[in-house]
Amino acid sequence: MNIKKIKKEDLSICLKIYKEGLNSGIASFQEPNITLDEFYEKVDLEKCLTLEVNNKIKGYAFFNKVSNRYVYNGVGEVSIYLSKEIIGKGYGKYLLTELVLLSEKLKFWSLHAMIFPYNLRSIKLHEKCGFKFLGIREKIGKMT
């Protein structure tokens, strides 16, 4: 297993993992037909890590600022996507832990994740990494 900063050439593999997550119905409100260019716009390479298993990218995680307002400069929203073949095998904890460490190096002081309430694996993963369940936001988005 290896965790490293993402490179632009990794994005096409990460996009496949992302679409796999979208097709699961529990990963995001995004539409599954996102293009590579749109994906590139979404992911800040400085704030993204990839997870390699047997020298192949099998997951990635990133965070973005939640707002451009000055008072929120150190607040980020986390996203993590794993290939279905490694879900439940403990890799996510290592990846998310490294992402939290990266966020601290970049002077972020608070991270949160927006997780569907029925994505229990993701909720448990985040709790193992120190995230706290704060509640359920209703009518925040709509599945297409």
Predicted features by range, described:
Residues 1-16:
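A short beta-loop-alpha structural element at the N-terminal edge
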Residues 18, 126, 131:
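Conserved active-site tyrosine of GNAT-family acetyltransferases
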Residues 31-85, 96-97:
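Acetyl-CoA-dependent GNAT
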Residues 62, 112-115, 132-144:
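Conserved catalytic-core motifs of GNAT/GCN5-like acyltransferases
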Residues 80-89, 101, 117-118:
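Active-site acidic-Proline motif in GNAT/NAT acetyltransferases
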Residues 88-101, 124-128:
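Conserved acetyl-CoA-binding loop-helix of GNAT-fold acetyltransferases
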Residues 103-115:
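Conserved GNAT acetyl-CoA-binding A-motif
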